[in-house]
């Protein structure tokens, strides 16, 4: 997506899709095993279903696999599974779903239906599986609480420094009008654990919840998140507690389920920060 469109929003045209397909073919010939997508993050979430089918079709003749962090793991969780199945079926590639979960208490009831959807697709001949981490929290950046368009064209920090844009971002967070995953809303600020600070003066917030930090600085959680990200000028590694133990146990029992850390390697002797227990 970055090769064809940079970090811009919008639909990829024919020449851009062709460039992406050429890159896929070359990568497959070089030894890649498939296509990975991260559809809640910019710029990946700017890609349409049709674009994803097209680039996966280029990997299909090489035996490529489609591995996806789906477009939703929460409010549109079931629709995201439908999209993954559609991409795999129409492109002719197997599908692997990254860290399957129903995020946010209001969505916990969807986990059983998600498993049923996957079972049904498998029974119909679709090669689809999933992986998970056996833990009730996920890890990503604090920027996952901001609408994706705020990061378009690589301008997140500029936008946070601009009063008008900051106001627009806040308005979308407070009254969501578009389909995107607000992980702070799903976890609640009381379930958002801050970990990844670079600046010495901010490390006092490491291992503390966003709600606590906001109370300490005397601002609401949105303004606190804006200030921290702008000051750090990085996404700030964050843990989001948003899954249920019952669903974790239920998913573990599925015969097509695998386990993955979804994490980077850490040297315990030299690491200075906190890490996800996965």
What are the language-model segments listed below?
Residues 17, 26, 32-83:
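Divalent metal-binding pocket/active-site signature
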């Amino acid at each position: 997506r970055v090769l064809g469109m940079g970090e811009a929003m919008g639909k990829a045209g024919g020449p851009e899709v062709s460039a992406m397909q050429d890159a896929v073919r070359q990568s497959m010939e070089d030894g890649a095993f498939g296509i990975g997508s991260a559809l809640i993050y910019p710029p990946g979430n700017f890609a349409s279903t049709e674009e994803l089918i097209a680039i996966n079709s280029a990997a299909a003749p090489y035996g490529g696999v489609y591995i996806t962090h789906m477009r939703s793991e929460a409010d549109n969780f079931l629709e995201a599974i439908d999209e993954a199945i559609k991409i795999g079926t129409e492109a002719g590639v197997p599908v692997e779903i990254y860290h399957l979960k129903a995020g946010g208490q209001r969505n916990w009831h969807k986990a059983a239906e998600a498993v049923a959807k996957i079972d049904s697709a498998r029974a119909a001949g679709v090669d689809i599986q999933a992986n998970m981490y056996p833990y009730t929290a996920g890890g990503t950046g604090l920027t996952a609480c901001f609408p994706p368009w705020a990061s378009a064209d690589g301008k997140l920090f500029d936008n946070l420094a601009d009063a008008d844009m900051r106001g627009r971002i806040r308005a979308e967070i407070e009254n969501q009008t578009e389909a995107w995953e607000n992980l702070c809303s799903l976890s609640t600020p009381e379930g958002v654990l801050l970990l990844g600070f670079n600046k010495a003066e901010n490390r006092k917030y490491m291992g503390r919840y966003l709600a606590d930090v906001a109370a300490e600085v005397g601002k609401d959680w949105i303004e606190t998140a804006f200030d921290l990200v702008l000051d750090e000028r990085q996404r700030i590694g964050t843990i989001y507690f948003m899954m249920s133990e019952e669903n974790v146990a239920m998913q573990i029992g599925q015969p097509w389920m695998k386990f993955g850390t979804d994490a980077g390697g850490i040297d315990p002797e030299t690491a200075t920060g906190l890490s996800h227990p996965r």
